[in-house]
Regions:
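Active-/binding-site microenvironments in catalytic and ligand-binding cores
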Residues: 1-275
Length: 275
């Protein structure tokens, strides 16, 4: 059976979400076929972007001195990882500052089974699905005069994860924590405790993830593929998820069709040589 794969990341562009004090992606179009008379002219661009742009992965070094940087996170930690999705979107709909609690995670486990060790635990708040296309709505800093002492920015209001919940999933063996908001600490926090808890225990965090309703609580796998920049504490990433039962398998009919197509192509090439 062909695999149904879901892209859980957002397209990276000049309008992508990033931390408010950072610069957005900047693009320099070096040349195009239309602007070059050189033979074999091609499109070529250069980009400048913040490591925390759009859907991205935080390595331990993002907050932890001496912590691992992006290139030191192994493929085994990122590829074919069991996905566990904890949905608190109904509570966030009533309270933009809601933090997923340990009780929420425990209730999810009672309903769907224990979160397997080694999972990437995703907290679905519904925030990105509803607001990602508009930075102002996504940051939700409703009062510019209300300045957050910790960030020095107008206080943002978006959901996150409680420290107790983060500690609980890491204690349970979670490989990483993902969320569909700007960060798992929520719109305002004193000292980014969730970052320190998760990254301080040598796990990773994925932020600004698309966690649509098609993702079930259990039974899917994921691969997170950050841009592998040496020494980087964070990097933009692709994030794919698919049902575990498919395992990217293809049917015998598809194999046979590919084999027949290859034989026909070889025969056609032989006829051209002999002509």
């Amino acid at each position: 059976m062909a695999c149904r794969c879901v892209d859980c990341g957002f397209v990276l562009s000049e309008s992508s979400v990033h931390w408010p004090t950072c610069k957005p992606l900047a693009r320099n179009v070096i040349k195009t076929p239309e602007t070059s008379e050189a033979p074999g002219a091609r499109n070529k661009q250069a980009f400048t972007l913040n490591g925390g742009s759009g859907t991205h992965l935080d390595a331990p070094a993002h907050f932890i001195p001496g912590g691992r940087t992006i290139e030191l996170i192994t493929p085994q930690e990122l590829v074919n990882v069991s996905l566990a999705v904890v949905d608190v979107s109904d509570k966030v709909a009533r309270d933009a500052d809601y933090r997923c609690s340990r009780a929420d995670v425990e209730n999810d486990e009672r309903a769907h089974g224990a979160i397997p060790a080694g999972s990437l635990v995703c907290i679905r708040t519904g925030w990105a699905e509803a607001r990602y296309g508009n930075r102002s709505d996504y940051y939700n800093a409703v009062d510019a005069s209300d300045v957050d002492d910790y960030t020095g920015l107008p206080r943002m209001h978006f959901p996150g994860v409680s420290l107790d919940a983060a500690r609980y999933v890491v204690d349970g063996g979670a490989r990483g924590l993902a969320i569909d908001t700007l960060n798992p600490d929520g719109g305002f926090s004193d000292g980014s405790p969730v970052h320190h808890e998760v990254l301080g225990r040598d796990r990773y965090i994925v932020e600004n993830v698309r966690l649509g309703p098609e993702l079930p609580a259990r039974g899917w796998l994921a691969t997170v593929a950050p841009l592998c920049v040496a020494g980087a504490p964070e990097a933009p990433a692709r994030f794919f998820a698919w049902p575990a039962a498919t395992h990217w398998s293809i049917g015998l009919e598809e194999v046979a069709e590919a084999a027949v197509a290859g034989i026909k192509a070889a025969q056609a090439k032989k006829r051209r040589r002999e002509a």
